[in-house]
UniProtKB/Swiss-Prot annotation:
It comes from the Eukaryota. One of its GO terms (molecular function) is RNA binding. PANTHER family: EUKARYOTIC TRANSLATION INITIATION FACTOR 3 SUBUNIT G (PTHR10352). This is ELAV-like protein 2. The gene is Elavl2. Induction: Up-regulated after memory training in radial arm maze experiments. The keyword Repeat applies. It comes from Mus musculus (Mouse). Keywords: Phosphoprotein, Repeat, RNA-binding. The keyword Repeat applies.
Length: 360
């Protein structure tokens, strides 16, 4: 007989992953007490489209990195939403936790903590879940599974065109034994809102080659975050108007901010794909550093690089810096939102980098 399930215990802030609440709803990774963990960090809840180079750039702004790894699904090659950063100096690792833990990047709030040494008990804890109600959210999926242990990452696959759930998801637990308990408790059961029982099994079971082939096909054409040339041209037309309005309102600022912005034609922005869109940020305070730029621009989209220009003698910020973003729409929205933004006692001037922009 099918059993109707109720949601398990809920966790605070589950939209971005479980936080320390109780034994069932705690941080994805325990803070390490061993000496070898004082430089090695685990970073949870990374944006799905964030690359290893972007992860390295973000944490490299804190201090010198010995190694950096974005963890990917062995079958699909897709990011699992977490990675590891190992610093050379333990002080930099501690600073990274204090500075970047809780940083909002796109729609995610990342969690940075000390990593534990790897062991067999925490490997192969990734579950494949099918038959989910199309209306089930990622938060509800986590609530359903959180009663069995600590969830590191979760994901629901959506149709690339409609954005509607495919009814398929993944849950990665902290330990394999927790994943085993979830299979025992939920496989063949009917969660709230479901008309059919769900299937819960290990995602990387070698005996399930057919399912692996299906998963690979699902990811052959990853969900493209960035539009093609024709779509991008149409979006530029819409955003040009937004930018013109933004710069018209803020015309009281330096002419450098407005020069060349009445139309985006003729702006000297790196043109070939992959280089990104370079943004000029002016009127930064002398004590400004790269982490400030990450915190400001991260919520708008994928940031590949940030750079604060410093005085060679004093190592203080010279008042300006640069941010590179991969997507035009996101870069333009960041400019429209942050130009004229008051940071401390300074009003920032933010624009696309032009020929007349200060050089590093």
């Amino acid at each position: 007989m099918e059993t109707q399930l109720s949601n398990g215990p809920t966790c605070n802030n589950t939209a971005n992953g479980p936080t320390t609440v109780n034994n069932n709803c705690s941080s994805p990774v325990d803070s390490g007490n061993t000496e070898d963990s004082k430089t090695n960090l685990i970073v949870n809840y990374l944006p799905q489209n964030m690359t290893q180079e972007e992860l390295k750039s973000l944490f490299g702004s804190i201090g010198e990195i010995e190694s950096c790894k974005l963890v990917r699904d062995k079958i699909t090659g897709q990011s699992l939403g977490y990675g590891f950063v190992n610093y050379i100096d333990p002080k930099d690792a501690e600073k990274a936790i204090n500075t970047l833990n809780g940083l909002r990047l796109q729609t995610k709030t990342i969690k940075v903590s000390y990593a534990r040494p790897s062991s067999a008990s925490i490997r192969d804890a990734n579950l494949y879940v099918s038959g989910l109600p199309k209306t089930m959210t990622q938060k509800e999926l986590e609530q359903l599974f959180s009663q069995y242990g600590r969830i590191i990452t979760s994901r629901i696959l959506v149709d690339q065109v409609t954005g509607i759930s495919r009814g398929v998801g993944f849950i990665r637990f902290d330990k394999r034994i927790e994943a085993e308990e979830a299979i025992k408790g939920l496989n063949g059961q009917k969660p709230p809102g479901a008309t059919e029982p769900i299937t819960v099994k290990f995602a990387n079971n070698p005996s399930q080659k057919t399912n692996q082939a299906i998963l690979s096909q699902l990811y052959q054409s990853p969900n493209r975050r960035y539009p093609g040339p024709l779509a991008q041209q149409a979006q530029r037309f819409r955003l040009d108007n937004l930018l013109n309005m933004a710069y018209g309102v803020k015309s009281r600022f330096s002419p450098m901010t407005i020069d060349g912005m009445t139309s985006l034609a003729g702006i000297n922005i790196p043109g070939h794909p992959g280089t990104g869109w370079c943004i000029f940020v002016y009127n930064l305070a002398p004590d400004a550093d790269e982490s400030i730029l990450w915190q400001m621009f991260g919520p708008f989209g994928a940031v590949t690089n940030v750079k604060v220009i410093r005085d060679f003698n004093t190592n203080k910020c010279k008042g300006f810096g640069f941010v590179t973003m991969t997507n035009y729409d996101e870069a333009a929205m960041a400019i429209a939102s942050l130009n004229g933004y008051r940071l401390g006692d300074r009003v920032l001037q933010v624009s696309f980098k032009t020929n007349k922009t200060h050089k590093a």
